Amino acid sequence: MKTDILIVGSGCSGLYCALNLPVSRQITVITKAGAEENDSYLAQGGMCMLKDESDYQGFFDDTMKAGHYENDEASVEIMIRSSRSVVEDLLQFGADFQRDENGELVFTR
């Protein structure tokens, strides 16, 4: 296989990466299982996004706990601080997220 960029993983992170690369490049996304068998596709209960600063510490603590406290704290901070812009980008790309009866996005936190 010849490609300019190889992305390993077809979950949300891998696909978001592919969407943000130059269209002039040959991009290949590979996955170890079917497209509907990755953790992003199988996730339940909505998504996480920093709604305001009062939510930061809880979001940070939950993320660290989910990673068994092996996460790089600086990376977790970047992920949390950029979560709103990532969600906005995904909506622009046409992502179909769960919404409530009022049409508002459903969040886990």
What is the predicted role of each segment?
Residues D4-V29:
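N-terminal Rossmann-like FAD-binding beta1-loop-alpha1 element of flavoenzymes
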Residues A35-R109:
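Conserved N-terminal/central alpha/beta ligand/cofactor-binding core
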